[in-house]
């Protein structure tokens, strides 16, 4: 079903692009460096790195002649924050995806995105989305003078696994104009068996997933005229003073998603704005005085506490280094610092620091001379070590 003739009213933005940029040697070298980042310890990456020049040259020939075909995927599960199937491709395919996504796919497909589509984009991301939610709440309070209002909070059930190949290829090829770009995109989409589902681990899948719900974004903003709307991948919210309007929006959104093979999660609900909403790792709520409060979600706090307990045991056994623990904790700490979480951070700083204050084996004697996780009043500092580049690094 096409609500209100929406699809017929919108015309795609055409952008000319030159496929040669994908197999340009310097771009392939840049893609190779991006693909190996953080993975140089893996055997498959080390094998390519030992003869990177030849690997890049072969890829350049395959792409220029149109003979490149994506390989098979390696599958595994992750369990945080929930169980998900991850499908990752080979280093060769990662190089192609970086070259294609960075030079053509993302620049072209992102052009029709609305401002409040936050996921996996340059200049956006989780903290941008959180700041937009904060600004929406402040604006709502200025307009209505209270925190009385309603929130429709929703996400799509099994989003990546439900994306239909035929609809996705149609959406992509309305924007890509070079037949070679269209052919490569189609090959990547069809590299997974069947006609439904794209792999979470692919760089291209992030761009495709952003585009697949672009129609929803414009429908909510331009047809339903909901100003206070934001989406991060398949997780989105609508804020309104009218509960019945949100119920009607819920119904129309389900009608819009059904032909695309999507359905909303059973946890989708409408609740009072003053209760606050969970979005992007924080619980954000609007007070009766118009102040916006942002706290780390309880699940995030519990997950970090469990990790620190696990790290303490692993450090005692020599299975984890101080640097590894500090890097993991610093990532969570930087995230938590975007909320009103000073006392929580101080508490967890002390827990992290206590790991290194316990009796440890002689393996850690040298490490214990280095600065540990910050305690109360201390500033967390972290140095980034750079490795020397080799082939294709210039």
Model-identified regions with their sequence ranges:
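Right-hand nucleic-acid polymerase module
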Residues: 2-4, 89, 98, 191, ...
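Non-catalytic, polymerase-adjacent accessory regions of viral genome-replication enzymes
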Residues: 1-57, 369-376, 380, 384-391
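Non-catalytic, well-ordered alpha-helical scaffold segments
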Residues: 26-29, 53, 57, 93-98, ...
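Short, conserved non-catalytic motifs in the polymerase core
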Residues: 38-46, 71-98, 112-125, 188-210
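A common structural junction motif
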Residues: 254-262
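Active-site-proximal segment of RNA-dependent polymerases
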Residues: 5, 9, 15-19, 103-161
């Amino acid at each position: 079903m096409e609500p209100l003739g929406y699809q017929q009213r919108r015309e795609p933005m055409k952008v000319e692009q030159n496929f040669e940029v994908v197999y340009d040697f310097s771009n392939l070298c840049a893609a190779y460096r991006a693909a190996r980042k953080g993975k140089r310890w893996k055997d498959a990456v080390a094998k390519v790195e030992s003869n990177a020049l030849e690997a890049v040259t072969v890829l350049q020939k395959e792409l220029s002649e149109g003979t490149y075909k994506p390989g098979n995927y390696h599958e595994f599960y992750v369990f945080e924050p929930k169980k998900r199937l991850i499908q990752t491709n080979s280093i060769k395919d990662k190089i192609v995806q970086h070259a294609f996504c960075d030079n053509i796919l993302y620049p072209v497909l992102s052009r029709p995105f609305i401002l409040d589509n936050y996921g996996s984009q340059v200049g956006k991301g989780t903290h941008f989305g959180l700041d937009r939610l904060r600004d929406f709440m402040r604006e709502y309070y200025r307009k209505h003078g209270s925190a009385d209002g309603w929130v429709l909070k929703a996400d799509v059930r099994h989003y990546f696994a439900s994306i239909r190949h035929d609809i996705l290829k149609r959406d992509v090829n309305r924007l890509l104009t070079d037949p070679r770009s269209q052919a490569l995109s189609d090959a990547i989409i069809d590299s997974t068996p069947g006609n439904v589902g794209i792999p979470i681990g692919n760089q291209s899948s992030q761009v495709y997933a952003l585009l697949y719900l672009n129609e929803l974004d414009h429908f909510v903003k331009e047809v339903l005229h909901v100003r206070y709307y934001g989406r991060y991948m398949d997780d989105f919210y609508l804020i309104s003073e009218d509960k019945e309007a949100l119920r009607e929006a819920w119904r129309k959104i389900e009608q819009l998603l059904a032909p695309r093979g999507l359905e909303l999660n059973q946890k989708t609900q409408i609740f009072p704005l003053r209760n606050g909403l969970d979005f992007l790792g924080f619980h954000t709520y609007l007070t009766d005085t118009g102040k916006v409060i942002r706290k780390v979600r309880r699940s995030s706090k519990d997950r970090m506490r469990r990790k620190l307990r696990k790290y303490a045991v692993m450090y005692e056994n020599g299975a984890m280094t101080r640097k590894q623990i500090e890097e993991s904790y610093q990532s969570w700490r930087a995230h938590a610092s975007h909320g009103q979480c000073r006392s929580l951070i101080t508490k967890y700083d002390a827990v992290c620091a206590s790991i290194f204050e316990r009796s440890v084996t002689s393996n850690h004697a040298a490490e214990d001379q280095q600065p540990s996780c910050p305690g109360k009043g201390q500033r967390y500092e972290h140095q980034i070590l750079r490795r020397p580049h080799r082939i294709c690094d210039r």
